[in-house]
């Protein structure tokens, strides 16, 4: 027999947890379903960056107020309590394969002197954040069901939505799909039929200590050219919120760890490295949905977007969707018109805010240049560029800085000029699709941004 609710939420990550908290506070009879037994335990690799403080992101000017321990979303008009550990970082440095040349996004030396005012952003404990959101949800009457693998979502004859999983059936007037980039809700409800699938990006992440890196409080990314391999590998190093000597260290595959730490030009950074814990991840990449609504199912966060909507973007979606559903039920409009405010907000804040294809620049940038070309290219940047963590902007910031140097590049390394033409918005989608066809996204995949 079905358990009946105003709202059934699938997924207890940032989007689902925020939707549950909001719905509970609004007095909706709500159930949240989660496949993990402990939703606040982070079992998937995640950098846990606050994305982003440096710019408008998804039409929001978000930031963390460390004085009152709140994440602030002033455009959308809400805050989120967070009193767990944090750690600032002050720049993003992209290193060349030789380990010497680098492209600095932000003046690390100057920014670190300014403390909180100079930070590019910060990292925090995602598990602590989820724990607080879900505690508030349950306190306000939300029923949480863990260990539930959803195996069906469909519209009922009476206009509601039925969700099945773990031998149980849950029926809601509305359903929110908050189950990530590989959303089962999106698949079951047919959202993906009109989307383009760009590939799946697996990765391996480590929390490590004992590093000796040039910029200890910065995000560092680098390419490495392993001998006798088809594609270069790469890595991310990001400060960890759990200790000043701890870092998040991510790469495409487990076999890259030994090469990067023992044989690469960066090996001196890792002479005393110690692995504390290890996590894996897989992120599916789809073009965004045309509309995050179908038959009383609303998608939030990663499930509707390309790659990842970040923790922050997912929370914004969850809150907006739950409030829209509340209004729809109060107005006795349990249909699309009732939740039109969420649909319109999502379109304005996500696909209309910026072209998602700008976020695709990371993938070809990592593979399309030879080792010699990459070393040369990154040696051209003599001064720090604009400080940004925004994946929509970073490609454009680099292109704008390169523009005055193209005549020099044409003379000194003409092969680069032709390759740089690929990094244009109208060409990039086909490049990524070609990478999927070639097997690149399986062999040398990308990693989530935050």
Each language-model region and where it sits:
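N-terminal FAD cofactor-binding segment of flavoenzymes
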Residues: 22, 35-99
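N-terminal Rossmann-like FAD-binding beta1-loop-alpha1 element of flavoenzymes
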Residues: 3-32
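Active-site-proximal substrate-binding core of FAD-dependent oxidoreductases
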Residues: 290, 323-374
